[in-house]
Amino acid sequence: MNFSVIIPARYASSRLPAKLLRDVHGKPLIQLTYENAVNSGANRVIIATDDKRIEVVANDFGAITCMTDGHFTSGTLRIAQVLEKLDINDDEIIVNVQGDEPMLDPSVIDQVVNNLATNPMQIATLCKQITDKAQYFDPNCVKVVFNKIGKALYFSRATIPFFREARDFDLKLCYKHIGVYAYRAGVIKQYLTMNSSSYEKVEKLEQLTALNEGFDIHVAPACASVGHGVDIQRDLDEVRKELG
């Protein structure tokens, strides 16, 4: 199945400045993410960035890059501009892989593409079960709840589902959202005409605007390892430890 991976790569990061260029055993973090994407079934992998420093580093390790404007509030908006610049057909499947997901197994990228192709929902994404109680209470861990057919009901940094009675607490009901999305190019382009929803603004989660606009998002547990996304220094330390 033909599809492209686009990796939105922003230099500025309030919680971990310049994190995509941080060294992980001789390679910048963004290179690890790129190499995993290349090892998927993608026809092409593009790094979309608004910063020359990332462009230079990415070109040095052989990546295709596309410069975008710097004012975008989400990775999807950055990808939408790439699609317009490259005149990509509306029917093409695009996978949005966050630049700070250096341990995402390539098969997971293929999985989310297959999920999009075999479901009627406009967007597909992934999750994994939370097994650590501390992670459930961590606002850096985005939680997702979904119904029996895999349709997302809500994403939040808050503790969802909330257990009113302590005796009912069960991590088997708790899932962490994995920051990889598949959608048709035409769906992504619609983001350019959307206003960020109030929910996105307060939670800082772009997928909440898609839900607010009426898009259906398919969610499924990842079929393979997704490792650590890197949001803070502790995450980066864990990645270095696991890959050391």
Curated annotation (Swiss-Prot):
InterPro entries: Cytidylyl_trans, KdsB, Nucleotide-diphossugar_trans. GO terms for cellular component: cytosol. GO terms for biological process: CMP-keto-3-deoxy-D-manno-octulosonic acid biosynthetic process; lipopolysaccharide biosynthetic process. It is found in: Cytoplasm. GO terms for molecular function: 3-deoxy-manno-octulosonate cytidylyltransferase activity. The keyword Cytoplasm applies. Keywords: Cytoplasm, Lipopolysaccharide biosynthesis, Nucleotidyltransferase, Transferase. It is an enzyme of class 2 (transferase). It holds the Pfam family CTP_transf_3. CDD domains: CMP-KDO-Synthetase. HAMAP family: KdsB. Activates KDO (a required 8-carbon sugar) for incorporation into bacterial lipopolysaccharide in Gram-negative bacteria. Belongs to the KdsB family. This is 3-deoxy-manno-octulosonate cytidylyltransferase.
